[in-house]
Amino acid sequence: KLKWAKYKLKALLDSARSRTVAEEPVRGLLYTRGTKPQVLIVMDSFSPTNRNAILEPLKHLDAVDVALWVPEDASDYLDGQYASERYSRKDWSEQEISGDELNNLLPDVRIVLSAAQFLGRGAVTYEFSRAIGAEYWMVQHGLLVPQAPPLPVGCTLLAFSEADAEFWASGRRDVTTHAVGSQLLYLAAQKAAGAEAQK
């Protein structure tokens, strides 16, 4: 619980900083695998829900050049649980960038995958996706509450369930939705099944 609270506090502070220092560009580490990334995965925090919702797709993107833009070092996540067994940390290049460099560094991106368009990197990459004509995919990473921010215009939502998709889209016609399940709940069920089998 303490780790979760620290992640939430850091995300809130990052969000507040990005609003109060508007002239300062959002910075982060950009990892790339391949020469022409077509998918940009964006994270504003490494919370457990974000790691499972946003990094887990790396396992299924073996044939695609990928970029990952994060607030801090992500080496631990690129060489094990979340990255494909085919790839290791050495397959990724790394550089510190600001959001205004995305257009020059990632001209071939077709999909931006994020969990929050209202935080620093999420907001910058939403604008980046609009500028280059890329799709912006939002991934549900936690339970929805009535205070959840609205989805960005024209996005594709990957939701836990049809009910979650319907609730969050709120009847909007500009949002495309897909019910894909929850990686966190899937892993919890697998862990519970494994523990039950060991009894």
Residue ranges and their predicted role:
Residues 1, 12-185:
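Active-site and donor-binding regions of nucleotide-sugar-utilizing enzymes
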Residues 148-149, 184-198:
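Acidic anion/phosphate-binding donor-loop and adjacent secondary structure
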